[in-house]
């Protein structure tokens, strides 16, 4: 097999807050860094996808504990939904504070979310168009609150989907959006570094928004289905004067590894509900109902197709290379393996070392 020259730093570890306890996830990221991973993307949910053995960890708190226990690991949410339960100004403040504590090690992933994370808190679940519009405004507010001093005092007019806003001479922000209003707000503890902001997208309009406003795209598209969405993202970014080559394209393939195939297959069951048809548009927030619906409607073949189920870790090398060949810049490894510590160690010894050797060729 000819080796693709891929920097192993472009491989990251995915931490599933819905599937594991906070204590176990801390053990996993410490082991992952020790073995060679230097970045982690982690989910941000209120409810899990699955009722049986599910968890509901508060991701922002976990990131602080994880960053304290690691030395260089970068942490990014995948993704935080700025729809209802999180006000965008609070997101901006929280991640600015994280960056002050761990400068250069914090990133923010934004998305339109799922009903399971909003409806339990008393909110309605709006249509996709409304969720995207709210998310777009939230991204603008977050970026404007993070903005550096050179913008202070400059009045900005509405531009396309961008709502009227301005800063006064002391740097206080006024934002008049359709969904969010900011009145004389200022981060007194701004971020020390530029915090990368990414957006999860798979549809055309969301991808255009990602290209226009953010530093990168997070998508679950398979390599052979990615060209169209990349073209939309690149075009949107270029129209804003950005070089698409400077932006991230992020994938998160789901993997289950065990030398025993049946054990590897069984470990994928936890994610069956994420494969329900049009699940992001459904007003179902109860994990018990999601689990039951998944068992009734999602066939085993669909589960197998959605996950790389392997009994030999080397069988992951070619599929991962395919992501990079089509243009992905970073791949976060989302393992649902029956023994996670074993997976991390074997993956690092066989796969990370493979790509590390490839960079020396």
Describe the residue ranges of each PLM region.
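Active-site-adjacent structural elements that line small-molecule/cofactor binding pockets in enzymes
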Residues: 1-361
């Amino acid at each position: 097999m000819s080796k693709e020259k891929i920097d192993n730093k472009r491989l990251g570890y995915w931490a599933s807050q819905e599937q594991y306890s906070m204590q176990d996830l801390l053990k996993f990221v410490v082991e992952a860094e020790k073995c060679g991973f230097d970045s982690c993307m982690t989910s941000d949910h209120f409810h899990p996808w699955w009722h049986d053995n599910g968890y509901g960890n508060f991701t922002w708190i976990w990131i602080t504990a994880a960053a304290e226990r690691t030395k260089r690991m970068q942490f990014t949410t995948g993704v935080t939904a700025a729809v209802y339960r999180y006000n965008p100004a609070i997101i901006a403040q929280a991640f600015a504070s994280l960056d002050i504590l761990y400068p250069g090690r914090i990133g923010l992933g934004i998305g339109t979310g799922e009903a399971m994370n909003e409806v339990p808190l008393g909110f309605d679940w709006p249509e996709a168009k409304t969720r995207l519009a709210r998310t777009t405004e939230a991204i603008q507010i977050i970026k404007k609150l993070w903005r550096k001093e050179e913008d202070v005092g400059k009045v900005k007019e509405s531009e396309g989907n961008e709502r009227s806003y301005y800063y006064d001479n002391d740097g206080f922000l006024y934002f008049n959006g359709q969904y969010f209003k900011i009145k004389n707000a200022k981060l007194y503890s701004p971020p020390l570094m530029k915090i990368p902001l990414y957006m999860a997208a798979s549809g055309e309009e969301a991808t255009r928004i990602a290209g226009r406003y953010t530093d990168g795209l997070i998508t679950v598209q398979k390599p052979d289905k990615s060209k169209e969405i990349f073209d939309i993202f690149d075009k949107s970014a270029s129209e804003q004067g950005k070089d698409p080559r400077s932006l991230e394209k992020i994938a998160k393939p789901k993997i289950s590894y065990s030398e025993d195939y049946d054990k590897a297959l069984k470990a994928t069951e936890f994610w069956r509900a994420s494969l329900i048809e049009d699940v992001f548009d459904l007003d179902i927030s109860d994990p018990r109902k999601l689990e039951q619906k998944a068992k009734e409607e999602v066939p085993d073949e669909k589960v197998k197709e959605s996950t790389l189920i392997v009994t030999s870790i080397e069988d992951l090398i070619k599929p991962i290379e395919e992501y990079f060949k089509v243009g992905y810049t970073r791949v976060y490894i989302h393992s649902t393996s029956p023994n996670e510590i074993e997976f991390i160690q074997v993956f690092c010894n066989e796969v990370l070392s493979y790509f590390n050797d490839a960079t020396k060729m």
